[in-house]
UniProtKB/Swiss-Prot annotation:
The modification Phosphothreonine is found at T147. The lineage of its organism: Eukaryota, Metazoa, Chordata, Craniata, Vertebrata. This is Ubiquitin carboxyl-terminal hydrolase 22. Changing H479A: Impairs its function as a positive modulator of androgen receptor transactivation. One of its GO terms (cellular component) is SAGA complex. The active site is at C185, H479. It comes from Homo sapiens (Human). Residues 176-520 form the USP domain. Keywords: Acetylation, Activator, Cell cycle, Chromatin regulator, Cytoplasm, Hydrolase, Isopeptide bond, Metal-binding, Nucleus, Phosphoprotein, Protease, Thiol protease, Transcription, Transcription regulation, Ubl conjugation, Ubl conjugation pathway, Zinc, Zinc-finger. Its main location: nucleus. Zn(2+) 3 binds at C76, C79, H93, H99.
């Protein structure tokens, strides 16, 4: 069922007026300034309409027992206590203090420990809706979606399926194999990564795409919306993505045909077509960056890469910022000279990765990507300060990080003299801090020397791994598979139609071709 803003004013009042009576245990809470207190909780810890409130929620809302913020956190309505619902820390508090009411900090529902269920109260519901609407307006999304009006078919489906599906920690909904239609493993592994991208999933499952194409049947975004519905329908039989393949062939003709294609090339082509077909989904909202729009693809995948070219004579700096969807990283063993790895002793731990002598890490690749590069005498530029052509250095850094960072390890080398696959093992972490590679951190690095970030509390640049695409075989003959994170620590291997459970060790020991990381903390604009 799609959740959208409720109608305002009289319609909402009429809806609430016919609601059933609420919980009989609310009397102990509804005293003195209870409405003011409840509004404060919704404003600060549930809907969080302002940037300041969202930052406060991200930093403050952790379980007071285990220090975790992901296990369905609830807040006591009688005192300042946050506790996990999943691990029953909030239950223990309620029993010890006899505080029988708590609020779900994700969805705003009120839970009664005496009733052992979420409860309804007309007065509380009015406050919740009012504060939610205020938060939407602060974020500029309050008027984006109309009230959901089910079709006749949807009404019939609701009659035959009145029960809500309960999602448990062992639930595998969203996992579904894909039939290989003839060397289409390159497409299947990318589809698995996209369908398990949290914000993309939320976008499509909330029916937010508004197609403006003359022929919706040719819209790749409409097909992706249908694909998400198929993946999260609960069906376990492998899906046949024939229509998706046809649309990709239609809109990206260089990928047409049954020969093996590059998964990275397919990813970029798919994002490009989705970006072009998302016209209208941003509801006319202007993008902050003129180089990209505000469609869901750009909101999730687009970052800004800063290039600083420094004159070696006057040291004047020319800066440009370009959008990117992925970061392609050179590997040792390629014809491109690789920066010396791992200076110093063995056994270092850098950015959460085991850094052993002779082992290449993702951090090594990023260090090389962001180091200053001397352009040489054959690539002189005209300096605006010197008014003449001078030698210069160029350095790339991250000006703006995307919500989903995709790292492309350049394993396929094509040159005039050779075509080969680079099989160098690259160690990559479950959690990644991109702070050292930001343009704002450039001053902390001198001459390309890596330094640990001094502000360990800077969570804006921290990422978690959620998908890995691998290539087995040679350049001429190979096969793509992917690892997908379903829950916090549950991983599955997707090999076309076959889905099997995988361990974290299986994931981290894999070769790695495309690495997908998701921001741990989000700040909505």
């Amino acid at each position: 069922m799609v959740s959208r803003p409720e109608p305002e004013g009289e319609a909402m009042d009429a809806e609430l007026a016919v609601a059933p009576p609420g919980c009989s245990h609310l009397g102990s809470f509804k005293v003195d300034n209870w409405k003011q207190n409840l509004r404060a909780i919704y404003q600060c810890f549930v809907w969080s309409g302002t940037a300041e409130a969202r930052k406060r929620k991200a930093k403050s809302c952790i379980c007071h027992v285990c220090g975790v913020h992901l296990n369905r956190l609830h807040s006591c309505l009688y005192c300042v206590f946050f506790g996990c619902f999943t691990k029953k820390h909030i239950h223990e508090h309620a029993k010890a203090k006899r505080h029988n009411l708590a609020i779900d900090l994700m969805y705003g529902g009120i839970y009664c420990f005496l009733c052992q269920d979420y409860i309804y109260d007309k007065d509380m519901e009015i406050i919740a809706k009012e504060e939610q609407r205020k938060a939407w307006k602060m974020q500029g999304v309050g008027e984006k979606f109309s009230t959901w009006e089910p079709t006749k078919r949807e009404l019939e489906l609701l009659k035959h399926n009145p029960k809500r599906r309960k999602i448990t920690s062992n639930c595998t909904i969203g996992l579904r194999g894909l039939i290989n239609l003839g060397n289409t493993c390159f497409m299947n592994c990318i589809v698995q990564a996209l369908t398990h991208t949290p914000l993309l999933r939320d976008f499509f499952l909330s029916d937010r795409h508004r197609c403006e194409m003359q022929s919706p049947s040719s819209c790749l975004v409409c097909e992706m919306s249908s694909l998400f519905q198929e993946f999260y329908s609960g069906h376990r039989s492998p899906h046949i993505p024939y229509k998706l393949l046809h649309l990709v062939w239609t809109h990206a003709r260089h990928l047409a045909g049954y020969e093996q294609q590059d998964a990275h090339e397919f990813l970029i082509a798919a994002l490009d077509v989705l970006h072009r077909h998302c016209k209208g989904d941003d509801n006319g909202k202007k993008a902050n960056n003129p180089n990209h729009c505000n469609c869901i693809i750009d909101q999730i995948f687009t970052g800004g890469l800063q290039s600083d070219v420094t004159c070696q004579v006057c040291h004047g700096v020319s800066t440009t910022i370009d959008p990117f969807w992925d970061i392609s990283l050179d590997l040792p063993g390629s014809s491109t000279p690789f920066w010396p790895l791992s200076p110093g002793s063995e056994g270092n731990v850098v950015n959460g990765e085991s850094h052993v002598s002779g082992t290449t890490t993702l951090t090594d690749c990023l260090r090389r990507f962001t180091r200053p590069e001397h352009l040489g005498s054959s690539a002189k530029i005209k300096c605006s300060g010197c008014h003449s052509y001078q030698e210069s250095t160029k350095q790339l850094t991250m000006k703006k990080l995307p919500i989903v960072a995709c790292f492309h390890l350049k394993r396929f080398e094509h040159s005039a003299k050779l075509r080969r696959k680079i099989t160098t093992y690259v160690s990559f972490p479950l959690e990644l801090d991109m702070t050292p590679f930001m343009a704002s951190s450039k001053e902390s690095r001198m001459n390309g020397q890596y330094q640990q970030p001094t502000d360990s509390l800077n969570n804006d640049n921290k990422y978690s791994l959620f998908a890995v695409v691998n290539h087995q075989g040679t350049l001429e003959s190979g096969h793509y598979t992917s690892f997908i994170r379903q829950h916090k620590d549950q991983w599955f291997k997707c090999d076309d139609a076959i889905i099997t459970k995988a361990s974290i060790k299986d994931v981290l020991d894999s070769e790695g071709y495309l690495l997908f990381y998701h921001k741990q903390f989000l700040e909505y604009e």
